[in-house]
């Protein structure tokens, strides 16, 4: 008969009527008992032939595709004009005096941030916007393009103009090398005297693979073709005299044909070959329309007219317009032809827009390195969208980048630090990631974009194939007309108006600020905010400022004090160029909500919504049905978060961990489920540790244990020899139960680490409950007063050590009040084990 829940609780010593601990506890280390209990509770799984359950409540397998819901009415969030001051270190020094080495190093990391992937894989532009919502393809396309456009306008993205240049909005940094008159025209006043145009430009620039006529032409008259590369400074200076009137597809060597007259004759042959050439940069003059074609190789190629003053006579050259504007002159093919839509407006605006600033960038191909799509901003805000960027190529495969590790405060450190009687408020940094500037050298690796509406629709619709597109004949133009597209565009026309034209063009953008989809970004953000908080803490030594990623909290003794601190800190952060969202400032009173915990003077507990999730999970948890191990990962993730607040802690979840590790299904027996249910029904706060002097010591040998409690010594023997770690753990449990002390000295590193998951399962669960809230101090064996009793010698007394205990705040570098001068090295080595210094959650 399976083990009843009551009996199981008695075995685990969770009920009062258990016998003396010295007899009962060693029994739990017995392998035979652990095996029998595991069999009774169905914890060691036979290979089950019953089909696995792949969904429990809201938990599906880790790799399942939960289909995100598309919202046609998503609003694109607005981004403030974020510009972090470049001399942020000087500004901080004016505020607080000289910065420490640590703070400077962290701030220098993000001014500017750099990104060096091992290798970068380039993807075709068609993959730029992921077809995540097959029923809302067109709507999603325009919403995403609008989001990208918004980011570009806010100075968060660069727009690739040519292979070697990009434009952006917002204020430039000193490391962004501006291109003055070299690659861009300043308007009609300089048309005659325009400097050499970047002709290898355009959206899809490739090395020329011109037609035979054109290549013969070039070889005979112009000498060898010069390579496509931007002008270096010296050439650029001299290039003023060269009139690059006609945008020839390949660059001519300097000095040949300085005027535009001679090659007017060969425009015809050249325009034929142009169709195969890399595109000429569109819209140097936005008032001229451009035309998009699909060359035989499937690349969109765009042309624009040349102003009459810049070349011979324009009449000899065919006039092309862009894909969108071509509909204006064509006959409607049906009631749902795009011609009807395009004729609604006289002026559809420019084909492209350029930023205020143009900079030179490393060679950037006309490709992307990651796809984008939209999702809800967060579970509580489904009205606004959030852009998801998939740069996962940098985290995969043999060339993956191993991102730097950084310290995340664990629960005990957090409680030691923040559990106090302070008043709290938390600040909301708006678009925190987009504060940190990236060096332009990273642009070629972090590219997003889209191939333009015509190709996007053609790729996704089954009836229209991109076949005979290079001649741009009428049927091909109307291939994309369909009722769905027409209806979608008509609805979108209400939202976006003439922007539909701009958004239907192809575009490539690179990140100017750190994107969220790269593993480097969380590290950089954590470094940045922790450095800023360190500065704030030194400026206001009587207060506490603390951050984890973009979550910044301030604490002060009284509410009035907190408000004045809030004003000062807000002004300081704004002076650095950090944007706060005042509507989202939360005042917590004395119990702070932070990182999923509620932290008050009594300690920490999980937030209410997590407790509700756990209750919900247990309500839906099936009994006696094998659950897919991927679903178990989800369940363990949730239960593991709240495990430190339960009686038995992490050890209670060990059977689940074991099944995940062996990739087996797990079956909950009624007793095990009831045990976990009861565990998570009553949560106990994790209290802050107090400093103190250690008076109680424990030690053990495989055969016996010994305690030193003040001047009293005790010893005992085990029924059978035990592994040394198990014996030491038992001795610590006896010390706690006999003395009630919350501070125990031990010489065993495993006991110190307070991870009881590697012990026999029943013992781990019971020991976790007995030792809950106990702090350990490391004492070397040679100095341990309990060493002699554990070896059976009671007569010999070692003097009691005065071992002070100082609670750790972890390696989160939060509270280390930064000294103004570096401190000298310690005189002597202290015996703090590494396990002790870096506290793990209890």
Curated annotation (Swiss-Prot):
Write the Enzyme Commission number(s) for this entry.
2.7.7.7, 2.7.7.49, 3.1.26.4
**Annotated region Spacer: where?**
178-345
Sequence ranges assigned to domain Reverse transcriptase in this UniProt record: 356-599
Any Gene Ontology biological process: symbiont-mediated suppression of host innate immune response
* Record site feature (Priming of reverse-transcription by covalently linking the first nucleotide of the (-)DNA), residues: 63
Keywords, ordered alphabetically: DNA replication, DNA-binding, DNA-directed DNA polymerase, Endonuclease, Host-virus interaction, Hydrolase, Inhibition of host innate immune response by virus, Inhibition of host RLR pathway by virus, Magnesium, Metal-binding, Multifunctional enzyme, Nuclease, Nucleotidyltransferase, RNA-directed DNA polymerase, Transferase, Viral immunoevasion
Which parts of this chain are annotated as the region Terminal protein domain (TP)? 1-177
Annotated residues that bind Mg(2+) are located at 428, 550-551
* Residues spanning the signal sequence: none
What protein am I looking at?
A: Protein P
Q: Name one Pfam family in it.
A: RVT_1
Reactions the enzyme catalyzes: DNA(n) + a 2'-deoxyribonucleoside 5'-triphosphate = DNA(n+1) + diphosphate; Endonucleolytic cleavage to 5'-phosphomonoester
Output the Gene3D superfamilies linked to this UniProt entry: 3.30.70.270
What domain of life does the native source organism fall in? Answer: Viruses
The region called Polymerase/reverse transcriptase domain (RT) is annotated at 346-689
Family in the record: Belongs to the hepadnaviridae P protein family.
Molecular-function GO terms, alphabetical: DNA binding; DNA-directed DNA polymerase activity; metal ion binding; RNA-directed DNA polymerase activity; RNA-DNA hybrid ribonuclease activity
How is this protein activated or inhibited?
Activated by host HSP70 and HSP40 in vitro to be able to bind the epsilon loop of the pgRNA. Because deletion of the RNase H region renders the protein partly chaperone-independent, the chaperones may be needed indirectly to relieve occlusion of the RNA-binding site by this domain. Inhibited by several reverse-transcriptase inhibitors: Lamivudine, Adefovir and Entecavir.
Matches recorded under InterPro entries:
DNA/RNA_pol_sf, DNApol_viral_C, DNApol_viral_N, HBV_DPOL, Rev_trsase/Diguanyl_cyclase, RT_dom, Viral_Replic_Matur_Polypro
Keyword Metal-binding annotated: yes
Native organism:
Hepatitis B virus genotype E (isolate Chimpanzee/Ch195/1999)
Domain comment? Terminal protein domain (TP) is hepadnavirus-specific. Spacer domain is highly variable and separates the TP and RT domains. Polymerase/reverse-transcriptase domain (RT) and ribonuclease H domain (RH) are similar to retrovirus reverse transcriptase/RNase H.
């Amino acid at each position: 008969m399976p083990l009843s829940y009551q009996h199981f609780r008695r075995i685990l010593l969770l009920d009062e009527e258990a016998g003396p601990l010295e007899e009962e506890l060693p029994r739990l280390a017995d392998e035979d008992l652990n095996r029998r209990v595991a069999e009774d509770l169905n914890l060691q799984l036979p290979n089950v032939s019953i089909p696995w359950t792949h969904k429990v409540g809201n938990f599906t397998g880790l790799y399942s595709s939960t289909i995100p819901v598309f919202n046609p009415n998503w609003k694109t969030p607005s981004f403030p004009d974020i510009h972090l001051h470049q001399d942020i270190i000087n500004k901080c020094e004016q505020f607080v005096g000289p910065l420490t080495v640590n703070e400077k190093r962290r701030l220098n990391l993000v001014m500017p941030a750099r990104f060096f992937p091992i290798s970068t894989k380039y993807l075709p532009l068609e993959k730029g916007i992921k077809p995540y919502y097959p029923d809302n393809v067109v709507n999603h396309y325009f919403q995403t393009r609008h989001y990208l456009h918004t980011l570009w306008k806010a100075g968060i993205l660069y727009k690739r103009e040519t292979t070697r240049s990009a434009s952006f909005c917002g204020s430039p940094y000193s490391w962004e090398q501006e291109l003055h008159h070299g690659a861009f025209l300043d308007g009609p006043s300089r048309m005659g005297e325009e400097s050499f145009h970047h002709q290898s430009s355009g959206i899809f620039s490739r090395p020329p693979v011109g037609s035979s006529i054109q290549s013969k032409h070039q070889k005979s008259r112009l000498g060898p073709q010069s390579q496509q590369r931007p002008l270096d400074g010296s050439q650029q200076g001299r290039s003023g005299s060269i009139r690059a009137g006609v945008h020839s597809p390949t660059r001519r060597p300097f000095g040949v044909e300085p005027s535009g007259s001679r090659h007017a004759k060969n425009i015809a042959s050249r325009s034929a070959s142009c169709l195969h050439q890399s595109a000429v940069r569109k819209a140097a003059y936005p008032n001229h329309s451009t035309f998009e074609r699909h060359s035989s190789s499937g690349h969109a190629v765009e042309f624009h007219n040349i102003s009459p003053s810049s070349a011979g006579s324009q009449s000899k050259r065919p006039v092309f317009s862009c894909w969108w504007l071509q509909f204006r002159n064509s006959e409607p093919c049906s009631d749902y032809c795009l011609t009807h839509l395009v004729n609604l407006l006289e002026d559809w605006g420019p084909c492209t827009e350029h930023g205020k600033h143009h900079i030179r960038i490393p060679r950037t191909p006309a490709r992307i390195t990651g796809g984008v799509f939209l999702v809800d901003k967060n579970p509580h805000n489904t009205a606004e969208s959030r852009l998801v960027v998939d740069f996962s190529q940098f985290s995969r495969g043999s060339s993956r980048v191993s991102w730097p590790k950084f310290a995340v405060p664990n629960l005990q450190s957090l409680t030691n630090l923040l559990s106090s009687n302070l008043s709290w408020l938390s600040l909301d940094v708006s678009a925190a990631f987009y504060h940190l500037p990236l060096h332009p050298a990273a642009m070629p690796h972090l590219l997003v974009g889209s191939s333009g509406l015509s190709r996007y629709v053609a790729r996704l619709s089954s009836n229209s194939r991109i076949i005979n597109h290079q001649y741009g004949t009428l049927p091909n133009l109307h291939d994309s007309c369909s009722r769905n597209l027409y209806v979608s565009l008509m609805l979108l026309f209400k939202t976006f108006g003439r922007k539909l034209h701009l958004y239907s063009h192809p575009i490539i953008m690179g990140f100017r600020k750190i994107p969220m989809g790269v593993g480097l970004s969380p590290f950089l953000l954590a470094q940045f905010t922790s450095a800023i908080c360190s500065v704030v803490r030194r400026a206001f030594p009587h207060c506490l400022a603390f951050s984890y990623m973009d979550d910044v909290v301030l604490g002060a003794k009284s509410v009035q004090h907190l408000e004045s601190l809030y004003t000062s800190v807000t002004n300081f952060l704004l002076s650095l160029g950090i944007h706060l969202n005042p509507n989202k400032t939360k005042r917590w009173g004395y119990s702070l909500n932070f990182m999923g915990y509620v932290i008050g003077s009594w300690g920490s507990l999980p937030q209410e919504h997590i407790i509700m999730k756990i209750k919900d999970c247990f309500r839906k948890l099936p009994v006696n049905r094998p659950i897919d191990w991927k679903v178990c990962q989800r369940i363990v993730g949730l239960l593991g978060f709240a495990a430190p607040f339960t009686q038995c802690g992490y050890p209670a979840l060990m059977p689940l961990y074991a099944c995940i590790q062996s990739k087996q299904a797990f079956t909950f027996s009624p007793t095990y489920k009831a045990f976990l249910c009861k565990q998570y029904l009553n949560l106990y706060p994790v209290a802050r540790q107090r400093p103190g002097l250690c008076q109680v010591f424990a030690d053990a040998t495989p055969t016996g244990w010994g305690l030193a409690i003040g001047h009293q010594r005790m010893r005992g023997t085990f029924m059978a020899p035990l592994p040394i770690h198990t014996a030491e753990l038992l001795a610590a449990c006896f010390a706690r139960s006999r003395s009630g002390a919350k501070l125990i000295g031990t010489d065993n590193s495993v006991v110190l680490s307070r991870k009881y998951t590697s012990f026999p399962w029943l013992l781990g669960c019971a020991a976790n409950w007995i030792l809950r809230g106990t702090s350990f101090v490391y004492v070397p064996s040679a100095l341990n007063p309990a060493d002699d009793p554990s070896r059976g010698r009671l007569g010999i007394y070692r003097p009691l050590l005065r071992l002070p205990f100082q609670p750790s705040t972890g390696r989160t570098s939060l509270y280390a009040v930064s000294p103004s001068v570096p401190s000298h090295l310690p005189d002597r080595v202290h015996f703090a084990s590494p396990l002790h210094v870096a506290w793990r959650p209890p």
